[in-house]
C-alpha cells in the first residue's frame, strides 16, 4: 500500500535476503521495483568473511512404536500440539541449551503451549533468561537486545514472529529451532539472526530439532 502511494518518487529500491521462489510474489515485487538483481549469496559472504560461518546440526528425536501409532491417527494440528506439549521433548531442549556455550536463541511457534513452558524450564538455570513474544513491548525487546550484546552466556526464548526478522544481535552463538516449521522463508530469516559477526564471534551453530514419528 505504501509503494502504491509513492507516485511521485523517482527512485524506489527494495532489498531482501529471502526472495520467495513463487512466481506471484516475484511478479508483485518486480511490478513495484523493477527486475530483481541478485547481488550475492550467503555462502559467498561467509567465504569472504563478511558473515559468520554457519554449522547446522540436525537432531532427530526418536519415539517408541506406541507413540508413533498414536500420532499417525492425528491431523496436522493435533500432531503439532502433541509435539510441542511433549514434556520429554521440552526437557531434551532444556538439557541441550544448558550445555551450550555462548548466547543462545531458542525459537518457538506457539506462545502459551510451548514458549512459556520452555521459558519456565530454562529460567531455572543459573543464567540470564529472557522471554520475548508478540505481547512484549518494543522498548523491552530493545532492552533485551542491548543486554545480550554485553552477555556471554544468556538465553533468549523468543517466538519466530518477533525474532525471525528485524532484530540485530551480533553476539548470538547458537540458534535452536524448538518448534517444527514448514516455512522456508521464516527458517532462512531466523538463521539470519545468527549470521552477524562480532569481535569474539566468527561462527554460529543452528540446532534443528526434528521428530521421527
Residue locations for each model-derived region?
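Post-DEXD/H (motif II) to motif III coupling segment of the RecA-like Helicase ATP-binding lobe
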Residues: 1-57
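N-terminal helicase ATP-binding lobe
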Residues: 1-15, 19-24, 122-128, 147-150, ...
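Short, charged, surface-exposed secondary-structure boundary motifs
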Residues: 22-26, 49, 136-145, 184-192
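Short, basic/glycine-rich phosphate-binding loops at helix/coil junctions
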Residues: 52-78, 122, 126
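Conserved interdomain hinge at the start of the Helicase C-terminal
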Residues: 71-109, 113-124
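Conserved segment of the helicase C-terminal RecA-like domain
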Residues: 193-213
Amino acid at each position: 500500500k505504501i509503494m502504491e502511494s509513492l507516485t511521485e518518487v523517482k527512485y524506489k529500491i527494495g532489498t531482501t535476503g529471502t526472495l520467495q521462489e513463487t512466481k506471484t510474489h516475484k511478479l508483485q515485487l518486480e511490478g513495484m521495483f523493477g527486475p530483481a538483481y541478485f547481488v550475492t549469496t550467503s555462502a559467498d559472504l561467509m567465504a569472504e568473511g563478511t558473515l559468520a560461518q554457519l554449522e547446522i546440526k540436525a537432531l532427530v528425536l526418536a519415539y517408541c512404536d506406541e507413540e508413533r501409532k498414536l500420532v499417525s491417527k492425528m491431523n496436522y494440528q493435533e500432531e503439532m500440539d502433541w509435539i510441542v506439549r511433549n514434556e520429554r521433548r521440552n526437557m531434551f531442549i532444556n538439557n541441550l541449551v544448558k550445555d551450550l556455550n555462548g548466547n543462545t536463541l531458542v525459537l518457538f511457534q506457539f506462545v502459551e503451549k510451548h514458549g512459556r513452558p520452555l521459558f519456565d524450564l530454562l529460567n531455572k538455570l543459573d543464567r540470564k533468561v529472557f522471554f520475548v513474544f508478540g505481547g512484549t513491548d518494543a522498548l523491552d525487546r530493545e532492552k533485551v537486545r542491548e543486554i545480550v550484546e554485553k552477555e556471554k552466556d544468556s538465553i533468549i526464548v523468543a517466538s519466530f514472529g518477533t525474532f525471525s526478522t528485524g532484530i540485530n544481535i551480533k553476539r548470538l552463538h547458537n540458534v535452536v529451532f524448538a518448534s517444527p516449521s514448514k516455512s522456508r522463508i521464516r527458517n532462512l530469516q531466523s538463521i539470519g539472526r545468527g549470521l552477524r559477526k562480532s569481535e569474539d564471534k566468527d561462527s554460529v551453530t543452528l540446532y534443528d530439532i526434528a521428530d521421527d514419528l
